[in-house]
């Protein structure tokens, strides 16, 4: 590994992966699956928090289908997946709130954070819905 890159040991100079350690965590893999669902909008919904809409295109599985595939391949028990999704929304809301605060303090010169503050409340509501209603 060189800095944030994993290099292919069989092919010198070939980058196999680029790592972003800033948001990395150790622990339950369902934490990552929960966060993936924050970034995985489905066709016909507007959550107001997604950063991409590519998963709304034909051919992409729904979050439920993705969870079923994950469980079938890993054997993971997804009975508490809604908790991980809720946690991910709250974490995302906190991260966005931090970005907004730094922007307002002038610590993000040159970065356009227009619209970020409007994402916080929907994230909190989606987190609540995941925890209380089991919404994925």
What are these regions (language model features)?
Residues 3-37:
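Active-site acidic catalytic loop and adjacent metal/ATP-binding pocket
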Residues 14-19, 62-77, 122-123:
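Short amphipathic alpha-helical segments and their helix-coil junctions
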Residues 6-16, 74-79, 113, 127, ...:
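Conserved NTP-binding catalytic cores of kinases and kinase-like/nucleotidyltransferase enzymes
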Residues 94-136:
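Regulatory N- and C-terminal appendages and interdomain linkers associated
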Residues 25-28, 55-58, 112-115:
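Pocket-edge positions in alpha/beta enzyme catalytic cores
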Residues 30-74, 88-106:
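Active-site activation/catalytic loop segments of kinase-like enzymes and analogous catalytic loops
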Residues 76-88:
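All-alpha amphipathic helical-bundle segments outside canonical DNA-binding/catalytic cores
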């Amino acid at each position: 590994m060189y800095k944030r890159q994993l290099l292919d040991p069989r092919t010198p100079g070939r980058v196999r992966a680029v790592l972003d350690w800033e948001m990395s965590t150790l622990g339950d893999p369902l934490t990552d699956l929960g966060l993936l669902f924050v970034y995985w909008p489905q066709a016909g919904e507007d959550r107001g928090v997604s950063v991409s809409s590519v998963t709304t295109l034909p051919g992409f599985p729904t979050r439920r289908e993705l969870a079923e595939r994950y469980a079938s391949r890993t054997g993971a028990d997804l009975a508490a997946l809604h908790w991980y999704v809720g946690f991910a929304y709250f974490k995302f809301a906190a991260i966005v709130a931090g970005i907004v605060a730094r922007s307002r303090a002038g610590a993000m010169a040159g970065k356009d954070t227009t619209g970020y503050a409007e994402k916080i409340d929907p994230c909190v509501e989606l987190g609540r819905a995941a925890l209380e209603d089991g919404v994925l």
